[in-house]
Amino acid sequence: MNDRTRKDRQYYRTAFFLNLAAGIFSFAWTISDQRGLFSLAGDFDVQQIPFAMYANDAIKSGNVIWDWSLDLGSNFIGGMSFYILGNPSFWVSLLFPSRYFMFIVGWLYVLKYAFAGLTSFAWIRRHVSDESSAVVASLMYAFSGYMAEDLLFYHFHDVVALFPLLLLGFDLLMQEGKKGPFLFAVLFNAIVNYYFLVGDVIFLAAYYVLRYFVPEGKKSLKGLFQGLFEAVLGCMLGLWLLLPSFFFVIQNPRVKMDYHGSNSLVFGAERYLYILKGLLFPGEVMSDQSAVIAHNFASCSAYIPMVGLVLVIAWLELMKGRKHWMKRMLLFCLVTACVPILNAAFSLFAGLYHRWYYMPTLLFALCGAMVLERKDREDQIRTRRAEHAANAAELRLRRDAEDRGEEIPEETLRSARREKSREVLLETLPSERAVRKGAVIWGCIALAFIFFLLFVKWSDSEPSKIYHIEEFTVWSCVCLLGILLTWLFLVRLRSRWKTVFVLSLYFFAIFTMGAAVFLYQTAHAEDARHHYDRLLTSGQISCLKDEYRVNSNENPETLTHGFMASGNFCSTVSGSIFRFYEALGLKRDVRSPDPPEGLAELVSARYTFEEEAREEGEPVQTVEGTWHSYYVYEDPSVAPIGFTYDTYMTYSDFLDTNKDNRAILMLKTLVIPDEKEEVVSRVLRRYSAKEDGSANKEHLSRISASHLEEAAEDVSRTTDSYSCTIRAASDSYAFFSIPNDSGWKASVNGEEQEILDICGFMAVPVSAGENRIVFTYTVPGLAAGILGTLAGALITAVYLVLSRKMKKREAQALPADEGLTGSEADSPARARR
């Protein structure tokens, strides 16, 4: 190992452990306070924790095909791939039993910050000669406002940590012809979260055009084609996860384009003000913000601890009149952030999100590293000049004294040296002038923003855009103090400025991240110990049968343990579930809708969990914990999943009925597609309220109990099947409240049957007598995805082997005295040149 390699590793270790320590300081206080546990708020407590715990158990038990507990049922891979299946931190958590997740998740957060710092350092160091400046910049990236605001979304942080590897791998390919790093960077970024892959592709395309194609033109096309080939290979290696996820997610109505007309070109004034706040203020609690917009989940924060955009403006000032790819990239980011349709492109035009802001944050950190390097270099030159000036002044005095035949006192010499040295040291460097200008500009913008919100009336209906004056005051002070300290340390301070600057930046990073954790916890979170007790206690419930659901929309009590429920929420679920709620006239977007009368009976939700005993009725099971107790009650009138109908009505007629009674009506009669009426009418008769009775709340219990006569028996439910026996008095249709995903196939008494879509659920024809009904499920795209991955692995292996052989031949063909030593050849400075 040469000195260069040893020094490089030292800086990598420094970057990792510096960010690791900052993460520990940010999280350790709350982990310690909660006896080793960690919880946060909202989505984190009721989604991220249950998802991780349930998926842990599901993977270890092999239940990874159909997820019965994800809402009303969904494809496990499709449902969980957006959140955790490709998430490195989740795979680390699999080393522990699921019940320990709340003990390790806080430390997993810390590791994410450490790795975000490490990967950002790896990319930034290629653009500066001073690795210590790159280390400082890694802290800016890892502890940006984006990382603080998005604490709620646990799975976002892995994306941020892996993103710099994408740029690093691409640079290695374009600049040095290194094959492989970009390929695997694409793989990791693709499987960690397919949603962010879209933004990665757009940003990388802009990066190629603005960094390589603009200055180099056609010369860069060879590298581009190599990059495209490696990108395809990287995606092929991830097809085992990407292809099933693609087939799954295209069913989701949240994946749609909703930009048109003038709103695609210009945001409203409020949104521009909100974007500016995300640059000025540290990341806030999404659901309870201090100003501009009270609650917003768009991830609109790109704050850099302490410095804000001061160093970005300073870098632009230093580069005035010079061409540089970073200028083009910053302009691209600015225009994209300000134009709605361009901003929306990063999420495939699906909603108003700003979840790509971690990308410009990396550029901001690089600007900071470049300014610090420039300042450090100029400061060293100034220090040497001051020393030379002091020596020259002393020499002149000594010569003058010798000419006069006098002896000069040492104090006079020291005074002259100090005066001359001070004169040089007080000179303002170009980098200091740039930082001063950046501080003035950014400070004026900050003051204008603060005073505007404090003193300007927004509208008659909403006079003030400040919702929490205390938090607004704190963040205003943090913003202005950071600008002031940046100016003070980088412009006014002449000695040990870098040490003081880094320590201050470190404090700001820890404070802003720790404050975000604190505010999230105080705004919404249940005490971690209480939440953990809730999880453990509900996990003791053991009386539930496979053919029934729980009437609940509480993820921690049901989804965590794989209990089927009527309202477990997840954003990524089978598209059939959306069709079901749409048929009921309900909207399902960021939460499961409140269940209407009859929904529990329709979906076979027989059980109810209560935390206090009812005055009437005996629970079928009682479990007690330290802070929580659960009483499990059942409704004997609820039929299991799988029961028959003797009447039908068409979907178009169903939509003409009262929305409030639609769930009861679905329980009363089979709601069929209009085009299937001719087939179904041969078996069932058309529903008539006059002859068959009305479907309303008063008749609900009787309607539900009527299905018990011909309901599922001998039920078997596995990860890829649902089977039961139904004894029918006559030919009819059996209904199953299982989402009609495209992967389902059905057979009755061994003969395959067409599945009838019932408002997103399933029904099959049954004959008079005993019917053995078997539903089997295969994940759409999984088999093809696995084959694609195997093919990609084979091509990748051949590609890398051939690349290595070609590299060896090229090395052997080079003259022995090519002019570079090994350490020089490996130096990142060579790539920078």
Positions of predicted regions on the chain:
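Periplasmic/ER-lumenal interhelical loops and adjacent helix-loop junctions
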Residues: V46, P50-A55, L224, A231-L318, ...
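Contiguous transmembrane helix-bundle modules in multi-pass membrane proteins
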Residues: G177, F196, R328-H388, E394, ...
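Soluble catalytic regions of membrane-associated enzymes that act on cell-envelope
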Residues: L95, H468-E471, T499-S732, S737-W744, ...
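Membrane-embedded helix bundles of polyisoprenyl
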Residues: N19, Y113-R126, S132-F213, Q226-F246, ...
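Active-site-proximal, structured, solvent-exposed surfaces of multi-pass membrane proteins
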Residues: N2-R4, D8, E677-L820, R833
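Membrane-interface helix-loop-helix junctions at transmembrane boundaries of multi-pass membrane enzymes
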Residues: G217-F225, V312-L334
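Membrane-interface coil-to-helix junctions
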Residues: A22-G117, L139-V160, V249-R254, S262-I304
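Start-transfer (signal-anchor) and selected internal transmembrane alpha helices
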Residues: M1-S32, Q226, L488-R492, R496-S504, ...
